[in-house]
Amino acid sequence: MTRDRELQALLRLTAWLSPAFPIGGFAYSGGLERAVADGLVTDAASLAAWIGTLVGNGSAWNDAVLLAESHRQQAQPARLAEVAALAEALAGSRERHQETMLLGEAFLAAARAWPDGVFERLPDKVAYPIAVGAVTGAHGIMPEKALAAFLHAYVSQAVSSGIRLGVAGQRDGLAVLAGLEDHIAEVARRAAASALDDLGSATVQADIASLRHETQATRLFRS
């Protein structure tokens, strides 16, 4: 029975963080489009460095910490509301706020195909990592596995954005993804043991790129 539950958890995690899950993540670049326009990301190597920095020290790290906290607090509505409010406050730009809130809303709407009381415990609108953390926690998915899948999905989407922006080809994009595997695993382990005191970032250029994207005249992405 334990193996059956573990397999069920794996299948659900794979479904929820698959590119095919209907949340619209393909529409967002998280400021990468502006970074490319400004010459900060020009090839596969700089794309890998940009993404890796965000995962370890930027917005993706903060999302991982928030996911871990909502995973732990999935049975506590009041605590979930507090963490959800914090996640909104940490959005560093209008587009970043729009991105995380719309992804969270879409994730919850799609995940309701797997009924659970967690949907009643969550606020009506929550940021994406809060939604993923609470739902995976409610379904008994181990936090480290949820975090690894979440971060891998983030990196995959960022690599896809880089390919669409022309800074890497398909083969180079796959090499970037493969090269970041160990980093993803290390950050997932670190985030699983994190607390809210571990929130923080050191990615000023990425934050500025996200802000500058709001006034970019020609663009493919919403952020």
Curated annotation (Swiss-Prot):
Keyword Cytoplasm: yes
UniProt cross-references to HAMAP family, sorted A to Z: UreF
Gene Ontology cellular-component terms listed: cytoplasm
Protein localization: Cytoplasm
Record has Cytoplasm as a keyword: yes
Main location, first listed in the record: cytoplasm
Name of protein: Urease accessory protein UreF
Gene designation: ureF
Task of the protein: Required for maturation of urease via the functional incorporation of the urease nickel metallocenter.
Species this protein is from: Rhizobium leguminosarum bv. viciae
GO MF term set: nickel cation binding
Family indicated by similarity: Belongs to the UreF family.
Quaternary structure and interacting proteins, as annotated: UreD, UreF and UreG form a complex that acts as a GTP-hydrolysis-dependent molecular chaperone, activating the urease apoprotein by helping to assemble the nickel containing metallocenter of UreC. The UreE protein probably delivers the nickel.
Keywords linked to the UniProt accession: Chaperone, Cytoplasm, Nickel insertion
Superkingdom in the source lineage: Bacteria
